[in-house]
Amino acid sequence: MNKPLILIGGGGHCKSVIEAAEIAGYSILGILDMPEDVGNEVLPGYKVIGTDDDIPTYVDQVEFVITVGFIMNPIIRIKIFNKVKEAGGKLATVVASTALVSKYATIGEGTVVLHHAFVNASAKVGKNVIINTFVNIEHDAEIGDQCHISTGAMINGECKIGERVFVGSQSVLANCITVGG
């Protein structure tokens, strides 16, 4: 497979995505991060090769995945998402090999589904979403664009999560709950 990929953001979330992307068949060419981090290694063999100002340089060569985390506010992730799209870039959808996504589920562009997550039949996950480790998204649940469903959260059947929502670690939403717009 060996699809070329550049990660945008060099913090902890980046470290979590690297192995998932490798196993999913991506060849990571490098990481874009802050100017002061250019040349630094995020993990052995994975260097910061530039900043998000370099996105237009790579749009014809690679796909991108946003690896800036989101806990308090998704604004940085949204700005980077828009910057990639405005430059004509393509955002990869990365699903870890240990995750299970039903063939009847829908996953939006730029979304990352990490290890041991489960997305059940008829679930819909929007664009640029983080589905973190051990998350369970049950049948007919809907996750809006630009969300972060944190480690171990359980989103039960027919729940609706609006856009730009953070669901914290180990949160449990009972069936048919709506959170956010």
Where would I find each of the regions flagged by the language model?
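Phosphate-bearing ligand-interacting subdomains
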Residues: 39-100
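A general structural motif
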Residues: 2-3, 28, 59-61, 88, ...
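Short amphipathic alpha-helical segments
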Residues: 18-20, 77-80, 125
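Structural signal for interior beta-strand "rungs" in well-ordered beta-sheet cores
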Residues: 93-181
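Short alpha-helical
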Residues: 12-13, 72-75, 106
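Alpha-helical elements of the RecA-like P-loop NTPase motor core of helicases
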Residues: 15-19, 75, 145
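Hydrophobic, well-ordered beta-alpha structural blocks that scaffold small-molecule cofactor pockets
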Residues: 1-43, 49-51, 56-57
